Structures are given as C-alpha cells and as structure tokens.
Amino acid sequence: MTTAQQLAMKGCHNFRAGIWKPRTKPGGFEGNGEKALPWLQRVKKETGMLVSTEVATPEHVELALKYDIDILWVGARTSANPFAMQALADSLQGVDVPVFVKNPVNPDLELWIGALERINQAGVKRLGAIHRGFSSYDKKIYRNMPMWQIPIELKRRIPSLPIICDPSHIGGRRELIAPLCQQAMDLGFEGLIVESHCSPDEAWSDAKQQVTPDVLDYILSLLVIRDEKTTVEGIQTLRKQIDELDNELMNLLAKRMRVCREIGQYKKEHNMTVLQTNRYNEILEKRGAQGALCGLSAKSVASIFEEIHEESVRQQLEIINQ
C-alpha cells in the first residue's frame, strides 16, 4: 500500500501488480495468488487508481473479473503459446475489459500479432500491446534486447493499436530506465509501464530494475514528448530527397542482381557451387570498412549485405536448378 499511495500522489492513474508470476525456474517468488486480489481492491478503493494484473489461464481471468480488476495483461511466456492464448481468448468471450498483450519472449512478430488477433476475435475491442524486449544470449547491456524494429513494424501494420513500452524488463537495471523511456517516447509509443517499489532493494522479484516513486516521478518529469502529427514544409522537402535516393537504391540493387544472375549462369556452365565463402567474407570485410568511413555502424552494414547476399544466392540457385 505504501508504494501505491506514493504513486497515486505522484499522479499515476494505473497500478499494475503481478498476482501470478511465472518464473523461468521453480523456487523463485511466483506471486501470492488469489489472496493478493483483495489487496488490489484496497488499492483501487483508497487511491482511486485503476488496477491491473497478468493473467495466464482461464482461472486467472475468472478470479480477476470476480475481484473487479480493471485491466488485464498477457505475459511474454503466455503470448508465445497459441494454445494458451486460445484458452485465454475463450475465457474472455463476451467480457468488456481492456487487455494488453506483451510481445512473446522470442522475436516473432507474427506470433505477437496472432496472440492479439485471438483476443480480438473473442470480442475484446479495447486491446493494446506491451513491448518488453526479446530474450537473447547477449545480455551485455539489456536484460531483453529492444529490437525496436519489431514494435515499429507492428505499429505500421496495425496503426490504431496502442503500444506501450516496458523499459524495466528491457533494461533489467534501474539506470537504464530513463533513457529507454525517452527512446520509447521518441518512437511514438503511447505510454510506459515502469516497475516501482518504495524500497526497491527489498522487492520480492526483479529488484534491480525497480525505482522508487520519487525517482519515477523525476524520470517522467524529464521526458520530452514530441508531437507526432506536426509536419512542416522543411521536412517534406527532405522526405522527397529520401524518396529520390530510395529510387536510386532500388535501381542499383536491380542492376546488382542482374550481374548476380550472370554470375549464376557462369557458375552453372562451369559446375561451380553457388556459395563462395571466401568471396562473401571479402565483401563483408570491404563493405564494413567502407561503411565505417561513411559513419555507418558495422552491424548495420553487415545486416544489409547479408540480406543482399541471401537474395543473390536465391536467384543463383534458381538459375542453377533450371
């Protein structure tokens, strides 16, 4: 209650708490279950905030609705399982409650969209998505890799879908929350879900990624909220330049692929394999060096030429197998 009261005083409108917490391994804190639902009722009554919790089974849905939980969300482990999602969707038939769906643990946009569609087809119209990052072996900086291109593509495909960001789970460390919050706002996310605790180091789960209500209030006060819809003449001129450059790029790629097909024909006539590893490594090395001189990241350059090479191989295989 102390945390809830402090957050309400800071102007927060929605209090989210995990009643059931699926853990990667057994033995950790997995939530207090049904006995904690009256605690959320008390938060709602005493602070006026809306309350929300995660549901993973039809039984969770039934109990959450029984205790008048205002908003439900589906966690990353559940959204990755179509069987679990369909069971949740069936339990939500005819229920008028907002539902947010977190991205699956693995970076699979179609799986995320499928989870959202199942809930929507159950008749839930107040639907949103939560971006909490994606699991990766590389945890040098983030607990979960942001991979911003995936929620951006989700927004492109479903423009009306509200998407909020969970910087706590992406960062995994409290010092990363502020910059991640700002990046989410810069990308046009509709909101944030940030973990807070009156005594973060004493939290029963994910203590390292929690901040006090005072720190949260300070982080939010520093956010720069940009106007997505404001367009000035200057940016339209620059966008026209981008369009012209993109046209040039497409023409150059088409020309490159024509040469690749000629190479494919040569390989066929001389009984050569399509994949020439030494040549591919040479291209990556040279283009990476060129990219660095042009101010491009090595990762971006490698990614671009990996895609180009994949398309080249595909077209050459077609020629060889004709």
Where are these regions (language model features)?
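Non-catalytic positions within long, well-ordered alpha-helices that form the structural scaffold/packing
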Residues: 5-8, 65, 120, 185
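Glycine-rich, proline-tolerant flexible connector loops at the mouths of alpha/beta enzymes
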Residues: 16-35, 198-207, 263-272
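Catalytic alpha/beta core domains of metabolic enzymes, predominantly
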Residues: 84-218, 222, 227-233
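Catalytic domains of carbohydrate-active enzymes, especially glycoside hydrolases
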Residues: 2-18
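Catalytic beta/alpha-barrel core
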Residues: 16, 30-32, 49-57, 70-84, ...
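Domain-level signature for soluble enzymes in the chorismate/prephenate branch of the shikimate pathway
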Residues: 228-322
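Glycine-rich anion/phosphate-binding loops
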Residues: 1-5, 35-38, 175-178
